[in-house]
């Protein structure tokens, strides 16, 4: 591999940065050698009702996975994000909202947000929601989504935010698994000029007979297109808040009380409800936000992520708001109504820090200079990348074109399960390499291991594991601690396995190489191959399916599905469309297969295991070295698949 040159730290950044290289090295060493002392001090970044005396109580031992931080302390997340800022910055903007339509935008101050959250928290209480109840939030990117989340946290209810792109079946599955009591949605969402039928999707989801505990649906009026309305069950947001008091004292919450559940794709079957608790999560989200973005008071920060993903939780809302930041929430997409929309928003709101995904960057890069036409972007100071590894070409384009070659890029590696950044540059402390996530954050102990779990030293490539706990770590999977241990701690004993592969270079920098398990990364969104395969096989004409990811220059990975039809069924253009729409309905648009490869048989071992390694190589056209196929029950299948692929390419 060609050596990638380092980008030095710009002098303008170094002069005012919160952290330099020497300080980083010193603090990082302390965080490993004496985590109790380090986190005992850093835990004070948030306000505690009852201060903690215990800091770290964790175990990665087989059969005893236990993760507890600040466990005797109490606090309230909503108070940390709102109440504590009222005296100093009550009139400062908390959220800038930019609508899908460029003519729609508004600013909400900390005082106004506090008022709205208290009102809505009282609405929840009036509806019988209490501490420990689960509330599902299926909302578009409007400030009310943030209000709903903060209101849940204020009273100790657990929120389960469901991405607005998910289908009714995906919504009902999450409602059933989490035992949801109340659903909050909108009549419709708006995205790139199109409407998303959120309320209709909720209606369809609640028709599932296994949904038993949802007694009410609160509906925010976004477009005014009402559709079906179930009297008694469905209630308008604006009518409920009109009668609610704006006085709502915070609930005292233990550090280890649940804060939220967020469902993420598993490599085996149904999605996993990742459970985060309150204290450690908020400390970690706050500290990582402050140092990784080198946040300075009064700066405008824009994270383009949806609230339905963990990035929207940690780095659109909770991290920024707990630090008293100005956070921008965008309803639309970066290339609508014009391909320079992202750049226009940067100029319009004088954005100082931009945090977006490689998918968006690659889509804009494909437009060339049109993506920045008529804009200056001179307000930008720091930029970030999230969701998947960023290829060096896209990194350089982002750096030169969007950032005018002056803004450090923090390429952050982390996961839903980690709660916050794990491997990331710090703007004033880390020289950058295009495409590398660089070095671990405080308290994070990464290691690379071979397939037997032996740690590899120096320059190497292997499975990325974390050898000790950190405060933002997920505590469990909702209602299934055994699956939590099985998923993350059984592959390599005594270590958290990320499911990602990585390379370490001569400077100790980490380069994430992508998933090593059966999870796809589509436009920064994780989707389990098993989930897509289940959806395909539920189609009445399909006998078997195997899904793999193949490189895609915009989305990172495309979904390539090998499909075997039932006896007597024949492939056709109509069936091709029908099957793609079927998956779209079962899971959501994000999971729609890009390519269907009709085939009579799949490469299987004698024990019946599908050899995905071969399918991945065929899908991506990497067929020169298919490796050992002697273990296949019928090696002739491979030749047939290659011929089919050739025919598909020609057609």
Swiss-Prot record:
CoA binds at residues 191-194, 311, 335, 523, 584. Acetylated. Deacetylation by the SIR2-homolog deacetylase activates the enzyme. The modification N6-acetyllysine is found at residue 609. GO terms for molecular function: acetate-CoA ligase activity; AMP binding; ATP binding; metal ion binding. GO terms for cellular component: cytosol. Mg(2+) binds at residues 537, 539, 542. This is Acetyl-coenzyme A synthetase. Keywords: Acetylation, ATP-binding, Ligase, Magnesium, Metal-binding, Nucleotide-binding. Its cofactor is Mg(2+). It catalyses: acetate + ATP + CoA = acetyl-CoA + AMP + diphosphate. Disulfide bonds: none annotated. GO terms for biological process: acetyl-CoA biosynthetic process from acetate; chemotaxis. Its EC number is 6.2.1.1. ATP binds at residues 387-389, 411-416, 500, 515, 526. SUPFAM superfamilies: Acetyl-CoA synthetase-like. The keyword Acetylation applies. It comes from the Bacteria.
């Amino acid at each position: 591999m060609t050596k990638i040159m380092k980008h030095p730290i710009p002098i303008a950044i170094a002069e005012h940065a919160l952290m330099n290289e020497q300080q980083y090295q010193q603090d990082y060493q302390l965080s490993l050698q004496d985590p109790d002392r380090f986190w005992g001090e850093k835990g004070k970044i948030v306000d505690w009702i009852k201060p903690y005396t215990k800091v770290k109580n964790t175990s990665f031992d087989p059969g005893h996975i236990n993760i507890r931080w600040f466990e005797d302390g109490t606090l309230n997340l909503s108070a940390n994000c709102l109440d504590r800022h009222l005296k100093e910055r009550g009139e400062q903007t908390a959220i800038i909202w930019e609508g899908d339509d460029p003519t729609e935008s508004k600013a909400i101050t900390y005082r106004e947000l506090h008022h709205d959250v208290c009102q809505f928290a009282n609405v929840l209480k009036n509806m019988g929601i209490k501490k420990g109840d689960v509330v599902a939030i299926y909302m578009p990117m409007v400030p009310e989504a943030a209000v709903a989340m903060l209101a849940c946290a204020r009273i100790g209810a657990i929120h389960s935010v469901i991405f607005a792109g998910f289908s009714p079946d995906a919504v009902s599955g999450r409602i059933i698994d989490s035992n949801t009591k109340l659903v909050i949605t909108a009549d419709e969402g708006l995205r790139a000029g199109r409407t998303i039928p959120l309320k209709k999707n909720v209606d369809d989801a609640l028709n599932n007979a296994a949904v038993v505990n949802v007694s009410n649906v609160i509906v925010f009026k976004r477009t005014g297109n009402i559709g079906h309305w179930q009297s008694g069950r469905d209630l308008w947001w604006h009518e409920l808040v009109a009668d609610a008091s704006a006085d709502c004292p915070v609930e005292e919450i233990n550090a280890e009380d649940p804060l939220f559940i967020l469902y993420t794709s598993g490599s085996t079957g149904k999605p996993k409800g990742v459970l985060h608790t309150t204290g450690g999560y908020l400390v970690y989200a706050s500290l990582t936000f402050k140092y990784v973005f080198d946040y300075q008071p009064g700066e405008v920060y824009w994270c383009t992520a949806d609230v339905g993903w963990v990035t929207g939780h940690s780095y659109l809302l909770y991290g920024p708001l707990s630090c008293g930041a100005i956070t921008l929430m965008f309803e639309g997409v970066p290339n609508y109504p014009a391909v320079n929309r992202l750049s226009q928003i940067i100029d319009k709101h004088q954005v100082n820090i931009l945090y977006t995904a490689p998918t968006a960057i690659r889509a804009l890069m494909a437009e060339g200079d049109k993506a920045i036409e008529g804009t200056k972007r001179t307000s930008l100071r720091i930029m970030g990348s999230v969701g998947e590894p960023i290829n060096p070409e896209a990194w350089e384009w982002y750096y030169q074109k969007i950032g005018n070659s002056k803004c450090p890029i923090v390429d952050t590696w982390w996961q839903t399960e980690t709660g916050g950044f794990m491997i990331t540059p710090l703007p004033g402390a880390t020289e950058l390499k295009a495409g590398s996530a660089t070095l671990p954050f405080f308290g994070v102990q990464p290691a690379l291991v071979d397939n037997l779990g032996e740690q590899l030293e120096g320059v190497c490539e292997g499975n990325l594991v974390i050898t000790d706990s950190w405060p933002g770590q997920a505590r469990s999977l909702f209602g299934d601690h055994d699956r939590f241990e099985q998923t993350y701690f059984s592959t390599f004993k005594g270590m958290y396995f990320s499911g990602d592969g990585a390379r370490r270079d001569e400077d100790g920098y980490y380069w994430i190489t992508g998933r090593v398990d059966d999870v796809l990364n589509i436009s920064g969104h994780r989707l389990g191959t098993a989930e897509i395969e289940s959806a395909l096989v539920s189609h009445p004409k399909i006998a078997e399916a195997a899904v793999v990811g193949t490189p895609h220059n915009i989305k990172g990975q495309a979904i390539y599905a090998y499909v075997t039809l039932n006896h007597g069924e024949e492939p056709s253009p109509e069936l091709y469309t029908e099957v793609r729409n079927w998956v779209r309905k079962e899971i959501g648009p994000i999971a729609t297969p890009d390519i269907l490869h009709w085939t009579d048989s799949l490469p299987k071992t004698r024990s019946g295991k599908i050899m995905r390694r071969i399918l991945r190589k065929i899908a991506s056209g990497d067929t020169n070295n298919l490796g050992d196929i002697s273990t296949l029950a019928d090696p002739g299948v491979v030749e047939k698949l290659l011929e089919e692929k050739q025919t598909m390419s020609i057609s």
